[in-house]
């Protein structure tokens, strides 16, 4: 899968959250010794310390663009989000730090997102262990300095990493051998008009089957918008959808994204609109 897609932040199991999240144990937390990850016999990815990373201001309004990609890169790394008063609220890791921060500021109250510190991995595709060790190091540094974990990393706090509420992929028919009582084109029309945002993709929302579909899903998720997906490759439940949809939308390729019953376009158009802030404005209408 393409690592450049705007995916959601990596979710770590609750068992990996620091025991110091409980006040009684915060002063005794000890992480296992850090060992540099190796690939081909060479150590990789040296991360900046939390205390040495420079804060980057986060605009309070989601409609305002984030700082440029040099300040907040769309790359793998570790990041810490601070409230406007300068208190660390959450430490996370991501394959796309920029997309993760964008997703946070759209879902988390504005009084929790004032600035962010970032340290980017040396490699384009670092091993997960490398990122996890950086995450542990930042948490350990903060806990050593303050005696407690950031609120968002405390077990039971779902403000930042709550389980995603994803609706299942929609199916247009019960099965390919079931006789339809209405034309397939009418089902498509009803679907795109009854749901604010619909993405017709190759594969499922959780497992897109092409890079373009994966990128579209990542962009929509990073905007925090509610959307439904339809798998155009599902010949059992969406038999004939691809050809019928091409005629309905007068658009020859997939994915296809509809907003408010109108076709927005495919991956290139959606990506361009997202970069210009036009997609966020469209979702607010």
UniProtKB/Swiss-Prot annotation:
Secretion signal, residue range per the UniProt entry: none
Residue span of region Disordered: 1-40, 53-72
Protein residues bound to [2Fe-2S] cluster: 210
Residue pairs linked by disulfide bridges in the UniProt entry: none
Keyword Chloroplast: yes
Residues annotated as binding glutathione: 202, 242, 254, 267-268
Alphabetic keyword roster: 2Fe-2S, Chloroplast, Iron, Iron-sulfur, Metal-binding, Plastid, Redox-active center, Transit peptide
Compartments it resides in: Plastid, Chloroplast
Major place of residence: plastid
Domain Glutaredoxin intervals: 185-285
Domain of life, source organism: Eukaryota
InterPro entries registered for this protein in UniProt: Glutaredoxin (IPR002109), GRX_PICOT-like (IPR033658), Monothiol_GRX-rel (IPR004480), Thioredoxin-like_sf (IPR036249)
GO cellular component, one term: mitochondrial matrix
Keyword Iron-sulfur: yes
Transit peptide (residue range): 1-45
Molecular function in Gene Ontology: 2 iron, 2 sulfur cluster binding; metal ion binding
Coiled-coil spans in chain: none
Biological process, per Gene Ontology: monoatomic cation transport
Classification via PROSITE patterns: GLUTAREDOXIN_2 (PS51354)
Bias (Low complexity) ranges: 1-21
Its job: May only reduce GSH-thiol disulfides, but not protein disulfides.
PANTHER family according to UniProt: BIFUNCTIONAL MONOTHIOL GLUTAREDOXIN-S16, CHLOROPLASTIC (PTHR10293:SF45), GLUTAREDOXIN FAMILY MEMBER (PTHR10293)
Family, as annotated: Belongs to the glutaredoxin family. CGFS subfamily.
Protein name (database record): Monothiol glutaredoxin-S12, chloroplastic
Source organism of this protein record: Oryza sativa subsp. japonica (Rice)
